[in-house]
Amino acid sequence: ITDGINQDTIGLLPDLTVADIARRIPGVTSVSSTGVAGPRSQSASENIVIRGLAPDYNLSTFDGAPIATASESNRAANLSLFPPAIVGRVEAIKTISADMNPHGLSGQLNLVTTSAFDRDEPFGNLRVSVGENSTAGKVVDDQGENIRATGLYATSFGSQDQFGFVAAGSFEKFYATTRAVRPGGESGTYYFYTDDPASNETVDSFADSNGFAAPRRNQIYLFENEQERASAVAKLEWRPSAATYASLFGGWFYQDEQEVRHEHLAISNQGIRPENQTENTGDWTQGRIEAGYVYQPEETTTTAITGRLTHDFSEDNAIDLTASFSSAEVDIVRNMSKFLPAMSEDTTFSYDQSSGNPLLTFVNPDLSNDPSISSNSYIRERYQDIKQDLIYLDGAWMHNYEEDDRGFGYKLGGSFVNRSHSFDREYIEGDVFNTDGCTEADITNCPLVTFDQYVEDPTFSTTDPNVRFFLVDDAALRADWIAQGKPQTTDRTDNSINTDYEIDETIYAFYAQAAYQTDRLKVHAGLRYDKTEADVDLYIRDVRLPSDPDSAQFVPAKRSYEYDFLLPSIIASYEATDDVLLRAAYTRTIGRPNFEYIKRGEAYSAPDDTDPSDPRISISRGNPDLKPLVSDNFDISAEYYFDNGGSLISIAGFYKDVDDLIYIVTAEIPDFEYEGNLYTATVNQPVNATGASVYGVEFGLRKDFADLLPAPFDGFVFDANATWIGSEFTYINAEGDERDPGGWVNQPELMLNAQLSYEYGPFGAKIAYSWVDEYLSNILADSGDVYDVYAQPNGVIDMQARYELTDRITILGEVQNVTEEKLEFNRRFPTGDLLSGNTQRGRVVWLGVNFQY
C-alpha cells in the first residue's frame, strides 16, 4: 500500500524540501527536528512522521536503497538536503513486504529518481526564482533575497536509443529571522511548590503541589538564519532490450546553515518560592536577566552512488541486483558566550500569566537595563564531527514474478547493510578578564569583563515594556579572549571525550516471497530473516583514576550487540470491478534502537557512605542488549475511480501492535560490588518495556470537474485527504511509574490536506491548505506529571499562480505560509494551558520563471 506524488504535481506548489511534499500525502506530516526545547530555530521542518510514529523509526531511501545520514543520536534522515527538482516521485510506502528493509514501524519514504526513458524524446527544465521572507533582516544583519535555481536535463542516445542520461542540479539560499518566546520549553521552567506556604520544596506531581505554576525561566530568542543548499546528480542508464536495464546513479548534496541565536533570559531563584502567589500571579524574591549569544553553523555533506541491474533470462526468470555506497558528514560549531549579574532582590520580577503567556514586571527596570552590572559568565567553543558510511547490497532471483505475469511465482534474495557511524566532540570553556589596571601575574585573578563593554545595537522589546533585550557583541568578546590566549577556567576535557563513539553495524537478511497473480487478484506472501551484529567503541569513566584533567578518568571500552528476527508479510489486492480496488495486508516491521541508547558511556558516581548501613552508588550506562521495537501491522483499503480514472475516493484503515518500547528507567541493584565493597546501586539506563498500539483511518478524494462544469469552470480539480489517528500508550518514567500522556510523541489525532487547482488556457493556479491537530511534542521530565508539551493546531496556506508566455516559458508567482502562521507549544496543567514556546514563521513571496525543454 503506497501513496505518492509525481513530479508533475510537485512543481505546482512552493514546496522547498521533500518533507514539504511528503506532508501532503495521507497519513504523513512533517515536524521540526529540534523540538520546542532544542537549541536551534524551528523555521525548517526536516523530519516526517508517517501514521503517528516517530521519525527515528522511518527509513528514507533513494530508488529503494537506504542513504547514509549523520546524526548525533538517531537514525532519521535530514530530508531538507534533497531538493524536489531532482525527484521524479515521492512515495510513502505504508506496508513493508519481506523483500524490503524492515526498519519502518509505520512505513518508509522512497524518493524515485527521474529516468531518461520516462519520455520518448529529450526533456528538461530550468527554473529560477527570487523570494522575500517577511521576517528576514529584522535583527542585526541586513539579509538579502531568497534564491532558488534548479535544472534537469534527460536524453536518450545510441543507435537504438539504448542509453539514457539524466543530469540535475540545484542551488538555493534562504534567509529568515525568528523570534521565539520559550517560558516553558524545558523541564526546569514552570515550578510547583508544596501546599505548605512556609516550605520552599518543589514537587513534580501536581497532586502534591499548591496547584500554582510559577514561571521561573522566561526565555526570548532571536534567531538569524541563513541556509545555502546545493546538489548535483547524474544518472547513466542502459536498456539494450526490453529484457535488460542497468543504471548508475551518483548524487552530491550539500547544506550550509549559518545561524546566530541571541538570548534574553529572565530567571528567578527557584530555591525561594514566589510571594503573594495565586493561580496566575506571583512575585519572585530574587531574579536576574542573563544575556547570551550562540553562533551555531552546521555544514552537511552527503554523497551517494547506486548501481542497479535487472535482467530477464527468459520469459519467467529474472534477476534484480542493487549496490549502493553513501557517505554523510555533519560539522557543527557552537560558539557561546553569556553575561549575567548576581541573583538579587533588586533585579527580580513579578509575573502575570492570566493570558496563558507569562508577562513580567521588573521591580527596578533602570537597574535591569544596566549592562554594567553583568559580568562574563563563560565563553565557549564546541566542535562536533559526525560521520556515517553506508554500504548496501541486495540481490534477488525472480520466477514468474513480474507485474504482468500470471499464476504462481516467487522471489528469493538477500541483502547486506553495513553502517560505520562515528561522533567526535572538542569542547573548551573560559572567561574574558578586564586587564585594565590589573597587575596580577595570572590573568585569571583579574576581574571579569562586564557586559557594557560588549553590547551590540539595536535593542529589542521584552514582555516588560520598560525592559529591553540587549544583544551580546560576541565578535568583540571573542577577539579579546583570543588576544588573552583563550584562558580556560572550566575543565571541559570530559565533555570532549565522554560522548565520542564509533559504531560498526552490519545487517544480513535473506527473504523468500511467493506470488499468485490473476487479472484481478494479486497476493504476495513472504518471510524475511534479518540479523544485526554491531560493535561499539566508546569511553567510560573510571572514578578510581586521577581526575586532573577530567578526561583522565575515561578509558576506552567496547560493547557488542546482536539480534535477529523472522518477519512475515502477506499483501493482497483485488480489483472488484474495473473501478474498485481493494487491498489488505499483514506485515511485521521493526524500529532499530537509536544510537543514543547504545553509545551512552558508563559512569559511576563517587560512593555515598553517609549512611553506613546503606552505602550507595549511582551508575549511568547504555544498554547493548536493547531490542528493536517490533510492530505487527494490519492494513485494509478501498479505492473507487470514476470520471474515466480522473477522480478518486479512497479509504484506508490500519492497526499497529508495537512491542518493546524503549524508556530510560532507574532500577536498584542490592549488593552491587564495587572496589571490593558492597553497595546499593541505582542504575539509570534504557530498557525495553511496555507495548502500545496505534490505529487510524485515512480518507482521500480527488474530483476532476472537466465533465461536470461548463467552460471556463471545467478547469477545476479538487484534492483532499484526512487522517484520524488514535493510540493506546503508557509512558514509564525513570522511577518506573506509569501514566497515560494522551498519545505518542509527534502523533496528531487529525491531519487534513486540501488543494484546489485551476487550468484555463495558458493560466494555471493552485492553493493548498495543510492542517495538523494538536499533538504531544515532548515529555520533558523523568518523573512527575507536569512536564508534557503539546504542539498546538497549525494550519498553513500555500499558493501558486503561473502563466505560459510560450510553449516553453512560464512565469510563476508563489506564496508560502500566506497567513504567517506561527508554531506554538503549550504546557498542559489541570488548571489550563500555559505557553511552552512559540516561534514566528514568515511569509515568503516568490517570483520566478520556468523554461521547459
Predicted regions and their residues:
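C-terminal beta-signal and adjacent terminal beta-strands/loops
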Residues: 434, 706, 770-780, 802-853
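Short loop/turn motifs that connect adjacent beta-strands in outer-membrane beta-barrel proteins
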Residues: 100, 116-123, 158-163, 243, ...
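Outer-membrane beta-barrel signature, preferentially recognizing the C-terminal barrel domain
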Residues: 287-302, 495, 499-506, 561, ...
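Gram-negative outer-membrane beta-barrel transporters
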Residues: 653-662, 667-779, 819
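Transmembrane beta-barrel wall of Gram-negative outer-membrane proteins
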Residues: 142-270, 290, 297-308, 314-317, ...
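Short acidic/polar hinge/loop motifs at secondary-structure boundaries
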Residues: 48, 65-94, 144, 151
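Extracytoplasmic beta-strand/coil segments of soluble accessory domains associated
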Residues: 19-66, 94
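Predominantly transmembrane beta-strands of Gram-negative outer membrane beta-barrel pores used
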Residues: 21, 59, 89, 93, ...
